[in-house]
């Protein structure tokens, strides 16, 4: 479950997740750099999309975050030749940065998990290499913000009137150093930025998962549909610079399937029992997987892990693939008296905070003659197994489970191996 990662993050005093090179290629820029300083924030405002939806009414255990991703876009013309550019950023919600359509940074789930009212982490990047530095050249800054860590269930208790965070927001300051040595600050405001609900991410939150429609263009390609933002005054705490990523994606620890099977019906059902799945076919690890309408494909990665699934797959435009996560299988002929929620061999989800509509990825294919790569970047899951369905035929050429952690590979200074396989497994977890 998601608590598995949160406990780890709390112990480490950090909250960060990762992601490099997905949904848009390898992240660019020259990486994290020193902050511009607290006084630079005075040149900026928190801004939100005026058309962003807000969750209202008493929040229940199954309440989902508001639909849509907020996009913020600004185009800036260089007054002189630029020799250096630093962008100091902060978000109310999970945010991803782009310069001229190229992703910035290798972190995932910025800004990470902090006390919602007291602190937010800022991330400052050297983006000089992504800019057109010539005099009078235009450069586009854009940001996607989704509800995670702010306007979703992870920080909102049941019974609260709406989510604790109402609208996603972004705040940033760009420092340009010109060829003559002068510097100028450009901060977020309602005059020079556009904002709106846009892009392929149509829903995302920590407990909910992510809905991604590849037929939709990112916000930096649909600026004409955006409008003036509004000032957001929800957060009154401190913005503190991060010391590095709060969460790391660990592709070096990626898990491959150990077992894959397909079922479509169950047998042996009786009063109080769902029965047992009838396995229609199995796939050897490493083989392509075919998903047909009406089928359930169960993929076992062999161990529970805080992670995100990574796909290479292909399907017809408009086809939706749904991937739901689980920590265990139903057993005992699906006996309801044992808390089972489906036939033996199907994935068990009754233990989840949002068992019906949460902990899932919905991916709708766009037009492509080739297989495409996808990994959700605005959420994470705790799971060992996934169950996959599709509205039309889909071929999965590759699927992996990519761990997320508060510990980067560079922080690992050694390994421990014992003569006991179970202890070795515990250590590796």
Task: Name each region found by the language model.
Residues 1-10:
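Bacterial N-terminal signal peptides that target proteins for export
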Residues 19-21:
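C-terminal motif of bacterial Sec signal peptides marking the signal peptidase cleavage site
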Residues 26-429:
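Extracellular/oxidizing-compartment recognition motifs
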